[in-house]
Curated annotation (Swiss-Prot):
Required for the export of mRNAs containing poly(A) tails from the nucleus into the cytoplasm. May be involved in the terminal step of the mRNA transport through the nuclear pore complex (NPC). This is mRNA export factor GLE1. Pfam families: GLE1 (PF07817). One of its GO terms (cellular component) is nuclear pore cytoplasmic filaments.
Length: 698
């Protein structure tokens, strides 16, 4: 409340006034003292009078002339000052007259004289005056002490303020540093954000660039693919054109041969009832037609399929023409023979007429297969040039055997040892051929090549060379070729993939040593006549076992091997042959042609299709040959090869099926499914086990 606040202010003001600072003794009544005792007693000097006289009065006398106030006023003013009487005995003793205030007796004498001259005042006034002086001194000392304490307090406050200011300055510096750090962080974040945005923009530009580059590469790739496709189409068109052109030349060659046969029929002109000139005129027209087609095709670039078809129709017409002429000649000859017989019947006697049918009766020519059944339809005549080639190879093989006959029949132990070492050196490396690594295959090839080149090789821990015997090279070549074929008969028959490493080594040796290749063919044709292709005929007087051996069957103790084993061996040798004609040694001279290339595979396939099929055998061999060599023939002959496959499907399959029994349909079904799958996908897969470029790096 306001009144209470004013009361407290009043009390505080009274306490701060001079009277409020007076000291009052409240326990005087308890001590039994009389209030008026001191007033009623006689005046007496205070115990402080000596000190006052000594210290205070001299100063008062000196300052009295200068003072403008009277003693009475001074006393009055002194009386008005608060009186403080210390109660401490120490203080009283300090101001007592007994304290040593007079150093000598002279001074004490002067003081006594001075004291005597002074007018004695009342004891209470002196006491009050002393108290006043004492109070002033105490007050002054207290003020000095308070000032000192105040100064110390102020210094303390100044130090505190200084420390506080220092702390505030530190806080300010910290705050400023924090602010700068925050600004730096903000600036750094802004810079990082800007950098990230720049990087993002850069990445975006890079992505756009990559996208555009990808699109451009795709376009370039598409353009390149289109160019390659067009180039491939152009190449195929040219190759097809060249094939058609070669076919046209072949047709013209055949046409000319037929024309020569037509001209050769002049000797029968007298027998014919028809006009031979009409046949010759039509033949000349057909020859001119084919020549005109070839001439027009040469001028326009390459012949078209229509031109080829027209030429084939002309050739077919020429064949029909020649066949009709042959029929006319045959008919005329029959008529002439009939006339001769009739004339002979008139001239000869009845006995001679009875003998004439026996003379004209043809002797039987039995043709029996391995089972003893007659198979006259299998006796298809092979082309003369093929039989000549077959016979030349067999003659060369026999001549080679005769050459080293002295070495094989020698009784000399040294010669026998040389023969055994040479045989091992020739056959063991062939047995070691495998698909383990290309480097291993190259070592085997180099060893065989060194042996055939007359260089010494290591075999069985000994050095062997064909120069150890004059007949050593012939012997090694024969045994090496025999071993290659035997590997096809045994190893390839069991593991079809083995055909390729064996074939590539055989092909490389064949290229460097052609005689070995001829001996390989001779051994192959002898063990597998279907690789010619050649179907041996059963001749009159021939033993059945000999005929079965000619067909390729193994006969031991008059027992013929099982059909499955026979087909397995034939399959292995055909697979080896199909691999040889398509493979070349990768380290050889690429500029030289293959010594026995794909053209022989085309020839084999064409000739096998021109012959009547054999039950179970033809289907098996065709499947093996096409599975191994079909991909290479497809790449080489392309359209013509596909035409041949269509021919097999449409014309040859019915012929095989017609002669195949229900128990032998497995091989035919396998061939049929393989061919239909190839025609459906328009591709022949790469055979399993084919040697790739990575194999030669292993």
């Amino acid at each position: 409340m306001p009144s209470e606040g004013r009361c407290w202010e009043t009390l505080q003001a009274l306490r701060s006034s001079d009277k409020g600072r007076l000291c009052y003794y409240r326990d005087w009544l308890l001590r039994g003292e009389d209030v008026l005792e001191e007033c009623m007693c006689l005046p007496k000097l205070s115990s402080y009078s000596g000190w006052v006289v000594e210290h205070v009065l001299p100063h008062m006398q000196e300052n009295q002339p200068l003072s403008e106030t009277s003693p009475s006023s001074t006393s009055a003013s002194a009386l008005d000052q608060p009186s403080f009487v210390p109660k401490s005995p120490d203080t009283s003793s300090a101001f007592s007259p007994a304290s040593p205030a007079t150093p000598n007796g002279t001074k004490g004498k002067d003081e006594s004289q001075h004291t005597e001259s002074m007018v004695l005042q009342s004891s209470r006034g002196i006491k009050v005056e002393g108290c006043i002086r004492m109070y002033e001194l105490v007050h002054r000392m207290k003020g000095t002490e308070g000032l000192r304490q105040w100064q110390e307090e102020q210094e303390r406050k100044v130090r505190a303020l200084s420390e506080m200011a220092s702390e505030q300055l530190k806080r300010f510096d910290e705050w400023k540093e924090l602010k700068q750090h925050k600004e730096f962080q903000d600036l750094r974040e802004v810079m990082e954000k800007s950098s990230r945005e720049a990087l993002g923009h850069q990445e975006k530009l890079k992505a756009e660039h990559r996208h555009r580059a990808k699109i451009l590469n795709l376009k370039l790739r598409e353009a390149e693919q289109q160019r390659v496709k067009q180039a491939e189409q152009e190449r195929l068109r040219k190759e097809e054109g060249q094939v058609r052109l070669r076919a046209l030349y072949a047709l013209r060659e055949e046409m000319l041969q037929l024309s020569q046969q037509l001209d050769a029929s002049e000797q029968h002109k007298g027998l014919l009832k028809v006009d031979l000139a009409a046949f010759q005129t039509r033949g000349n027209q057909l020859c001119s037609l084919i020549s005109g087609i070839i001439r027009a095709s040469s001028e326009s670039g390459y012949p078209t399929t229509e031109s080829q078809a027209e030429a084939e129709r002309a050739l077919q017409e020429m064949r029909d023409l020649l066949m009709n002429l042959g029929q006319e000649i045959t008919r005329a000859c029959e008529d002439k023979r009939r006339q001769d017989e009739e004339e002979a019947q008139v001239k000869l006697q009845e006995a001679q007429m009875q003998q004439r049918p026996e003379a004209h009766k043809e002797p039987p020519a039995p043709s029996q297969g391995p089972g003893g059944k007659q198979n006259e339809d299998l006796q298809v005549k092979v082309q003369d040039i093929t039989m000549q080639w077959y016979q030349q190879l067999q003659d060369a093989s026999m001549q080679c055997v005769l050459t080293f006959e002295g070495l094989t029949n020698s009784k000399d132990s040294q010669a026998k040892k040389i023969k055994m070492d040479l045989q091992k050196a020739a056959t063991i490396p062939v047995s070691q051929i495998s698909t383990i690594a290309g480097s291993k295959l190259k070592e085997i090839f180099d060893k065989i090549h060194s042996l055939l080149s007359g260089k010494p090789v290591q075999s069985g821990g000994r050095s062997v060379s064909v120069t150890l015997n004059p007949q050593g090279l012939d012997f090694v070549q024969y045994k090496l070729a025999e071993k290659f074929v035997k590997q096809g008969e045994e190893e390839v028959a069991s593991h079809h993939e083995a055909a390729f490493p064996i074939a590539v080594v055989a092909s490389g040796i064949w290229e460097l040593h052609p005689r070995v290749g001829d001996l390989i063919l001779a051994h192959l044709h002898k063990k597998c006549p279907y690789s010619v292709p050649f179907y041996p005929t059963f001749k009159e007087g021939m033993a059945l076992e000999d005929y079965q051996r000619m067909l390729g069957y193994q006969v031991k103790d008059s027992k013929v091997e099982q059909q499955d084993n026979f087909l397995k061996r034939m399959s292995g040798m055909i697979r080896l042959y199909a691999a040889i004609i398509q493979l070349r040694w990768p380290y050889g001279n690429r500029q030289e042609i293959h010594p026995h290339g794909l053209n022989h595979g085309w020839r084999w396939l064409a000739q096998i299709l021109n012959m009547e099929p054999l039950s179970d055998v033809t289907a098996t061999l065709l499947f093996d040959f096409l599975e191994v060599c079909g991909n290479a023939l497809m790449k080489q002959y392309q359209v013509q090869f596909w035409k041949m496959l269509i021919l097999i499907k449409e014309d040859y399959f019915p012929r095989i099926e017609a002669i195949t029994s229900s128990g032998q349909m497995g091989s035919f079904i396998r061939l049929k499914q393989f061919l239909e799958k190839c025609l459906q996908h328009k591709d022949i897969p790469v055979p399993k086990g084919f040697l790739t470029s990575s194999f030669w790096r292993s």
